[in-house]
Design a protein with these regions (language model features):
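Canonical Rossmann dinucleotide-binding motif of NAD(H)/NADP(H)-dependent dehydrogenases/reductases
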Residues: 3-40
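Conserved mid-core segment of classical short-chain dehydrogenase/reductases
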Residues: 62-71, 75-79, 89-112, 131, ...
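Short, small/polar-rich loop/turn modules that mediate ligand/substrate recognition or access, typified
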Residues: 180-182, 239-241
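Short C-terminal tail/terminal secondary-structure segment
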Residues: 229, 240-266
Length: 266
């Protein structure tokens, strides 16, 4: 029995860069369930890499900072995939550089570029692709488990993700005027990905977060992917304009007794 009911359906995924990408794990779960996956990557170099790990796949190139490229992308995809049953937006970027800076020293250009790529791109993508979306399609983006925890290494990306969380609600309301397309986010806690490796000091925070999980085992990318695919399926038809937190219980365990005991003994 196909519980998810996504076999034979077509999904567009933005953001695969390598095998450690969240988007890659999502594509694997979709493919295992019998879905058709179409990929969008940022550059020819990334396309070459993704072609090696996903041979024979439909892979398109689009730099989402340029709206004309998104428009052309939709035109190109429509020729071979005129109906999409879902879109995965797994795109984020922050120009952290090599030195961790205090939040108040955030440069305007860096902040606005992050908003453009990590948040506004979703608005632009769904607007351009709206005529290709099935009336019951699902759009899922990747956010973070909390934007209220001021973790220094993540810097201005937390406010950017907060904007993304709000954007989900407004897109859901806006699209409801002419369709039943749903918009949700999967709000994941710390993951071991290539992108996160570029965040200054990330590893220490990742290992600490692992100790805060109720199971004392870090969140796996595959677990995030499973949640995304559920939201893409009709089995989640009653969920719209929501952020589903996937953090292995970390958010209720900031006062973990073992960690407190170790800290107080120092």
């Amino acid at each position: 029995m196909d519980f998810l009911g996504i076999a034979g359906k077509t999904f567009l995924i933005f953001g695969v860069a390598n095998k450690k990408s969240v988007a890659f794990s999502i594509s694997q779960v979709l493919s295992e369930a019998g879905a058709k996956v179409v990929y969008v990557v940022q550059s020819p170099e990334i396309k070459e890499n993704v072609s090696r790990i996903l041979p024979g796949s439909d892979i398109y190139i689009c730099n989402v900072e340029h709206e004309q490229e998104i428009t052309k992308l939709a035109e190109d995809i429509s020729r071979t995939h005129p109906r999409l049953h879902g879109i995965v937006h797994s795109i984020a970027f922050a120009n952290y550089g090599t030195r961790l800076k205090p939040f108040h020293e955030t440069r305007k250009n860096d902040f606005l570029q992050s908003v453009d790529i990590s948040c506004y791109s979703l608005i632009s993508i769904v607007n351009v692709f709206k005529d290709l979306l099935d009336k019951n399609a699902s759009v899922v983006t990747i956010s973070i488990s909390t934007t209220r925890m001021a973790a220094e290494p993540y810097g201005w990306m937390a406010p950017v993700k907060a904007a993304l969380d709000s954007t989900i609600c407004f897109l859901a309301k806006s699209f409801s005027a002419f369709s039943q397309v749903r918009f949700n986010s999967v709000n994941a806690s710390l993951l071991k990905t290539s992108a996160s490796a570029g965040i200054p000091g990330y590893l220490d925070y990742y290992l600490f977060a692992e100790q805060l999980t109720l199971r004392k085992k870090a969140l796996e990318t595959r677990e995030v992917a499973n949640t995304v695919v559920f939201l893409l399926s009709d089995r989640s038809s009653g969920i719209n304009a929501q952020g589903i937190v996937v953090d292995c219980g970390m958010s209720v365990n900031y006062f973990d007794k073992n960690i407190i005991d170790k800290t107080m003994r120092v």
